[in-house]
Amino acid sequence: MAKIEMKTPLVEMDGDEMTRILWKMIKDELILPFVDLKTEYYDLGLPNRDATADQVTMDAALANKKYGVSVKCATITPNAQRVEEYKLHEMWKSPNGTIRAVLDGTVFRAPIMIDSIQPVVKNWKKPITIARHAYGDVYKCTEFRIPGAGKAELVFTGADGSQQRATVFDFEGAGVLQGQYNKDDSIRSFARSCFNYALDVKQDLWFGAKDTISKKYDHTFKDIFQETYDAEYKEKFEAAGITYFYSLIDDIVARVIRSEGGFVWACKNYDGDVMSDMVSTAFGSLAMMTSVLVSPDGKYEYEAAHGTVTRHYYKYLKGEKTSTNPMATIFAWSGAFKKRGELDNLPELVHFGEALEAASLQTLNEGIMTKDLCGLAEGITPTAVDSEGFIKAIRERLEAKLA
């Protein structure tokens, strides 16, 4: 069988620990036998980030900007323990944070659903994709303890020296104070990424904030979303047969629980942080969550939503077999192939991405699973296999689909 051709390379970002091992297995078993793979390779493993003073991360992000589609393996964000373990020159920043900043992107997370694992919320029948605005708000706030009585003020000094001030509170005793911010440009970029992604997947977009209480801060989010929709996306949404829906965040949460799923849920930073964990847990497993970073100008970075699976890696180093779930990493590759094929007008590459996903889902639906999923499966008697056995089982089904 002739290998499937590519035109433009994918930007390939290798990673760390057990996911790095899975990365090679997936390439060797599920990609290289079928695709004449073209990638621009960047090693984002922690030793190489340290050796290049993290320049490799910036280079990979800029390559993503140039070529438009990347696929990324999970990476370590070092803490003090990792600095010691890897003898690092310094505590390097999160690669995801660096790439997100370069692309000005929004992260979209969605569950991979299979027949035998039912969501905890029984009426959820379709995936719910969470879009989190990963900038500002409480994550960039300034805060301090108030030692005793006094007046707290909010002061803005303009570039021309003029001032606006407002009293926050007259403290009668000890307390706590916090100031947070966001930027119109960042909110607008977030809105555009959300509208573009909803068009991409042809699903309704929901957004909620608390504009009735926060009449300036949250209201700005509401207004910018509405202005952007009316000016740039209304006609496109109507043509695609999808809708944009805004409501108060508490109403949105209630509607999400009552819904059957099948939409994109745009969230402010804190809401997205909390709700993405709620949604992923209710759907079954973080190992079954896909993640894609989308920039406002249509650049894509696909990855798994989980970490590097350190515990399994230490077992692997001792020569033990591990049953690590590769589904989210496989779906990162398949998502990248589908998007690259779509942009380059290569239907065979799109079909390969679809076939890879279908073969993976078929394997699970037939009861062949990694150990983490066996305890969640209902209505079947699952067979637990190690990572290698699982990937080989997918390959058998993939070969049949491509024959």
Regions flagged by a language model, labelled:
Residues G319-T324, E342-A403:
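Internal helix-turn-beta structural module
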Residues V256-A355, Q362-E366:
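Glycine-rich phosphate/nucleotide-binding loop
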Residues V35-Y41, V201-A209, Y233-Y246, G341-G353, ...:
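Flexible, glycine/charged-enriched surface loops at secondary-structure junctions
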Residues P47-A159, Q163, Y270, V274:
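N-terminal glycine-rich phosphate/adenylate-binding segment common to multiple enzyme folds
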Residues M6-M25, L154-S247:
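Glycine-rich phosphate/diphosphate-binding loop of Rossmann-like nucleotide-binding domains
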Residues A2-M6, M18, L22-W23, D28-A53, ...:
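N-terminal alpha-helical transmembrane segments of multi-pass membrane transport
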Residues L46-A60, K222-F263:
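N-terminal small/polar loop signature for handling phosphorylated ligands or for N-terminal nucleophile
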